[in-house]
């Protein structure tokens, strides 16, 4: 079964810090998020639907759950609409920070049928986290993992 991801980059949206290892302009090729998310997803789905059995929509490059809620829901609504139209879309995933996870945020993600939460942990050593200007602690990660594991999400931990 062939699988693909549609990567939607939201460069530095809601990132409170300038972490030493992150250069979203270089990664995404731009500092601006996609303005026409519906058009972008439709074009990507049309392009991929004949070549892949399963496709997921992946929001990367920022702290997705830290985006102002109306804006976050605008992105999630577009993903939900694409998922309804293109039956090969099997999941919606996003990356975020451990300190941007709460019961309320997880309720919102469940409402839009997000399947996977990727936490940018980077380290479980508080000295390393402070030196790299992450702005969260190892305990924040532990709390976020506990909250996510109570729900039906798949969980990915990212380390740099």
Question: Where would I find each of the regions flagged by the language model?
Answer:
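Conserved non-cysteine loop/helix-boundary elements of the Radical SAM core domain that shape
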Residues: 27-38, 61-160
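Short microdomains enriched in Cys/His and/or Lys/Arg
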Residues: 38-48
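N-terminal pre-triad scaffold of radical SAM enzymes
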Residues: 1-28, 46-61, 65, 95-97, ...
